[in-house]
């Protein structure tokens, strides 16, 4: 018998407060040092457990993604396979975050799926076990599963909890799709930033090693960042295209948003060192 719908599981966006590329490994992946922080803007997912093993996804996204490529369904299937759970789930995604903008929305959706279904299926895997499943699907997924702001190293899987200031951000989503794979394959991408200790990294100005390359290739990103820099310290998150400015108060961030040119899209968000997903998980 199908159960009631379990509602309002958040999948928050993340920002890379800094992103340094330290080298390329023999397997083609890049060694990184980055600082992840969540924000309070989220996709929302609902789940209903079913007796049969089918996995069904309903989404508000206009773009159709093949089931085999959809991270939410791949995450649910991976949890089934890892645990031997013989039921399934019906899943509803309310997609609110920009896609492909460096905010981690797809990875966050997959992480929320793993965490929520682990609870609802009563499969009782630890966060570390869920993160190991998630890492096979995407390097950003473990940080969303663990749910704390983190200094990440390696390909992004080695995490250390940190507590950066929970500032207010104005995030602008330029009308551009930046391919993460293309950025990391570009010969002009800096790959030799020295590895530094966390205390040193936290005390120096923060930067994104991908930013100069992306700005040079995407005029929309350059325009958004140039506008935002007039109001606040600003930089790109991930490989873009989204950029963010830092404000000490919501009022300041909203005042800047009110001046946003009509051809740009943006939103104000609060930095969070504990993910809204963890808050939801701790509810009955």
Swiss-Prot record:
Keyword match Transferase: yes
Molecular function, one GO term: 4-(cytidine 5'-diphospho)-2-C-methyl-D-erythritol kinase activity
Keyword Kinase belongs to the record: yes
GO annotation, biological process: isopentenyl diphosphate biosynthetic process, methylerythritol 4-phosphate pathway; terpenoid biosynthetic process
Broad EC category: transferase
Coiled-coil boundaries: none
This protein's UniProt keywords: ATP-binding, Isoprene biosynthesis, Kinase, Nucleotide-binding, Transferase
Catalytic activity: 4-CDP-2-C-methyl-D-erythritol + ATP = 4-CDP-2-C-methyl-D-erythritol 2-phosphate + ADP + H(+)
Active-site residues, Swiss-Prot/TrEMBL: 14, 140
Enzyme nomenclature, EC number: 2.7.1.148
SUPFAM superfamilies: GHMP Kinase, C-terminal domain, Ribosomal protein S5 domain 2-like
Binding site for ATP: 98-108
Functional pathway: Isoprenoid biosynthesis; isopentenyl diphosphate biosynthesis via DXP pathway; isopentenyl diphosphate from 1-deoxy-D-xylulose 5-phosphate: step 3/6
Family, as annotated: Belongs to the GHMP kinase family. IspE subfamily.
NCBIfam families: ispE (TIGR00154)
General function of this protein: Catalyzes the phosphorylation of the position 2 hydroxy group of 4-diphosphocytidyl-2C-methyl-D-erythritol.
Family matches, as HAMAP family: IspE (MF_00061)
Protein name from the UniProt record: 4-diphosphocytidyl-2-C-methyl-D-erythritol kinase
